[in-house]
A protein has these predicted regions:
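RecB-family 4Fe-4S metal-dependent nuclease core
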Residues: 1-319
Length: 319
């Protein structure tokens, strides 16, 4: 079976080879999900359910059902605030775009498409491109677009650097190529970003009162929390990205070959040590502590995943 190359996996490969090795070659992952990832996934789930036809009320109810009981490892107040944040962001998003004129051609489109050598047209015998497109929509002018949802913890205003970076974002290019390979003649990407709130729970304030205050703030400053714009992809940009994909696949194959000759395969994958990389890495304590990973006996707090792409397996089970 060919290994899957997703946008998230390729980003990990570019960010730190050791992190990529542990996460995608060994399948190591934290047992407990970090708050930003958990909130983003639940928010995304609510949008998906609504796009698939569920009412706003049921979409919010379903997206927040995992917050019904606070786990032992979290603070009950923090847990309740997170739930209120999720409810308010979903309600605000539904309100903000209730008058949009998007026709959904597909919702949560999971894909596996060939990785092709751009110079020869040969198909990779080792890897396939995989992922999940949030949606394919028809715009009011009749064009097809890939719809991509994101949550962000930074400025998303019209002049923010956030939008400048998207001009070179590989995930967008991958999704355009995948959608076209699956028969959707997409012309652009509609990028929908929701900013996470910066207001915090006040002293003596209940989580419910915080949620009401957040929803009021969203109503008064919708553009602060929600932005949506087109991100085009030109044909020459897609051609360059195809070359980048093939180059990264060759790099990964070279790493695998070298690892096969070493007593500690992790040594073939050098570390990218720095504040920006280590500060956001789930393996930082293990890596900086010089811990050697045995996948048959993972460190406390970690597990070895049976599938390194659980987000894709989840979709396949629902299909």
């Amino acid at each position: 079976m060919k290994a899957k190359l997703t946008s998230t996996r390729l980003a990990a490969l570019r960010k730190c080879l050791r992190m990529h090795y542990w996460r995608y070659e060994l399948g190591l992952a934290r047992i407990r999900t970090a708050t930003p990832l958990r909130l983003g996934a639940a928010f995304h789930r609510g949008l998906e359910l609504h796009n698939a036809g569920l009412s706003q009320e049921l979409a919010v109810e379903t997206a927040t059902q995992d917050y019904a009981a606070c786990p032992q490892w979290d603070d009950p107040t923090d847990w309740a605030v997170e739930r209120e944040t999720l409810e308010s962001l979903l309600a605000g998003h539904f309100w903000r775009y209730q008058e949009d004129d998007l026709a959904f051609e597909s919702v949560e489109l999971t894909f596996e498409v060939p990785l092709v050598n751009p110079d020869t047209g040969a198909v990779s015998r080792t890897f396939r491109l995989a992922g999940k497109v949030d949606g394919v929509v028809r715009l009011p002018d009749g064009r097809l677009a890939v719809l991509e949802y994101k949550t962000a913890g930074e400025d998303i205003g019209p002049d923010a650097d956030y939008w400048l970076r998207l001009r070179c974002d590989g995930q967008i290019s991958l999704y355009v190529l995948a959608a076209r390979a699956m028969g959707y003649d997409v012309a652009t990407v509609l990028y929908d970003v929701t900013r996470k709130p910066t207001i915090r729970l006040r002293k003596g304030e209940t989580p419910e009162a915080y949620g009401e205050r957040l929803l009021k703030d969203i109503g008064e400053r919708p553009d602060y929390y929600f932005q949506r714009r087109e991100i085009p992809r030109l044909e020459d940009e897609l051609a360059l990205f195809r070359a980048e994909l093939w180059q990264q696949a060759k790099h990964l194959m070279a790493l695998r070959r070298r690892a096969g000759h070493l007593a500690d395969p992790a040594a073939a994958h050098f570390r990218n040590v720095g504040r920006m990389t280590c500060g956001q890495c789930e393996f930082a304590a293990l890596c900086l502590g010089g811990i050697r990973i045995d996948p048959d006996s993972p460190p406390a707090g970690y597990q070895v995943l049976p599938d390194v792409h659980p987000e894709l397996a989840h979709q396949q089970q629902e299909a």
